[in-house]
Amino acid sequence: MHGAPTSKWDGKDLWKKYDYRALGVIGEPYFDVDFGQVFYLTDTGRCWDGYKVSVRDKIPRYQDEWVAAGLVYHATDDIIRAAEEGSLPHRIMITTHPQRWTDKRVEWVKEIFTQTIKNVVKRILIWITS
């Protein structure tokens, strides 16, 4: 729950005012997972190494450590290969955006075009705010 990358609001900020546990929410991954013990993978940017273009969907504190350890996967096949070889960490949190997945060619082309444009905009936002 992080919100749109171009929004000035971060959805996680909601929990600065409200206690999600008091509302029956069991846990909030960005707050309750120890990423020193759990590797984080997300398909943001239509790839598994989308942290480069992600404004909010990332764990900056640990990303450099994961990259230095070789935990960089671009395609799903890379993740599968690492799992088969036994080099994938045993503890992983995976965040996906299934609304972007399709096996329909026209929808897939539309999604890749749109996401490519969004990634360019996100790179610019990251550069401006760095």
Show which residues each predicted segment covers:
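Terminal accessory/targeting
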Residues: 1-130
